Amino acid sequence: MNLSYIVASSFKNIMKFCVLMTYIFVSCNKNSVTRNPFLPELDFEFSINLNLPLYDNLKFTGGSLLINDFGHKGIILYNLNYNNYLAWEASCPNHNPNSCSKTKLLGVLTECVCENYQYSLATGQLLNPSPKDTNQYPLINYGVRISGNNLIIYN
């Protein structure tokens, strides 16, 4: 093995390393995700049995149901499609919880009673933002996993 081959090989490895490090440093971003200041984090886990008649609406795509016992103002469960379920906080995310901040279900939407903000249950996004408000938050999403006939909802 000659010396020029070793030098060329080492130079290629150094160049690869420099390119990789440049990519890593350029990829870093100081902008962080803005956490919703109105609704603090909650710690919970519960399950529901989809075989019970109470949860029949969740057996169909687009079906939704409000469960009042968890979350700030309850949790909305939504059947996105056959095996994909979503769980959303039922409290309007754009102000402190109060007497009118619980959202109401409107088919595949939920609406904040205070400002009539409407949110998609498929994405959690605000559908009718107000031009005067600068910080508008989506619904808070909770985790859902399927275990047999049970949905386990957690945060």
PLM-predicted stretches and their roles:
Residues 15, 25, 89, 97, ...:
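Mature extracytoplasmic/luminal segments of secretory-pathway proteins
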Residues 101-139:
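Surface-exposed, polar helix/loop patches in the mature regions of secreted/periplasmic/lumenal proteins
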Residues 31-107, 120-121, 140-155:
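N-terminal pre-ligand scaffold of iron-sulfur
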Residues 1-2, 93, 127:
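Short regulatory "switch" loops immediately downstream of catalytic or recognition motifs
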Residues 1-28:
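Sec-dependent bacterial lipoprotein signal peptides
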Residues 29-32, 112:
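A sequence/structural signal for flexible, mid-protein segments enriched
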